[in-house]
Amino acid sequence: MDKLRAKIRDIPDFPKPGILFRDITPLVKDPAALRLAIHQLVHPFVGEDITAVAGMEARGFIFGALAAWELGVGFVPLRKPGKLPYNVQSIDYDLEYGSARLEVHLDALGVGDRVLMVDDLLATGGTARASCSLVESLGAEVAACAFVIELDALEGREALHGRRVHSLLHY
């Protein structure tokens, strides 16, 4: 994992003072590092009858689509409001300083689907928890959640209430 960790750039005081931002853009720019990250992200789930990967907007789309390709399954984007052109299911959830909403097409998933949830970062777990609930509201099963980075001190894993979580890098 040292090869991947070397591709994460630390940006102090972004997006506001006191925050240390973990920038994944050097990782996604490097083809060898990106291949390694995707392989390591999905490796624990090979052979587990995953039927789809759901990616959380926006950086989850990068890793989620590639994870779906690696697993040979489809990709389902979980979007911010007003971005999907068809009928949607939505979920509202609380953030540290406000609220947010995610949407998914009503016909994207259903009973019998086993979904791997993918995002770049697990922090407090609010977005991931809401994403899991959104997928389950369509009748699908959340098989596991996979993240490139987990910020352990923020205890996002606990917010996922015992769900299976796989993270490549811990900070």
From Swiss-Prot:
InterPro entries in UniProt: Ade_phspho_trans, PRibTrfase_dom, PRTase-like, UPRTase/APRTase
Enzyme class per UniProt: transferase
CDD domains (alphabetical): PRTases_typeI (cd06223)
Reaction(s) catalysed by this chain's protein: AMP + diphosphate = 5-phospho-alpha-D-ribose 1-diphosphate + adenine
Family designation: Belongs to the purine/pyrimidine phosphoribosyltransferase family.
PANTHER family cross-referenced by the UniProt entry: ADENINE PHOSPHORIBOSYLTRANSFERASE (PTHR32315:SF3)
Protein name per UniProt: Adenine phosphoribosyltransferase
Organism from which the protein derives: Methylococcus capsulatus (strain ATCC 33009 / NCIMB 11132 / Bath)
